Amino acid sequence: MKAFNIKTEYLKNPLGIDIENPRVMWNCEGGVTQNAYQIVTDDWDSGKIESSSMRIVVPVKFEKGKRVTYRIKLWDENDTEGDFSEENFFE
């Protein structure tokens, strides 16, 4: 199971977003149902969050104008850990 079509504030790798706690959303491929996810940025790691939701409001305030790169990992309905997504960013 892997996250794809990853967006921040409905945009792919946006520049110039002016939001302290951005929304990140994704779709999943492989497996039947997402059971958990993890988001890892340069400075923050959500840890494994048990949820089928494919969106999160990142609860960390990031410095405006700084590029933040992140990856997402998913677990399926059998709690099988997937691979990290490709690296994404917002700035």
PLM region spans:
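Recognizes extended acidic, P/S/T-rich segments that occur
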Residues: C28, V32-R67, K73-S85
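Pro/Thr/Ser/Gly-rich low-complexity, intrinsically disordered linker/stalk tracts
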Residues: M1-G31, E86-E91
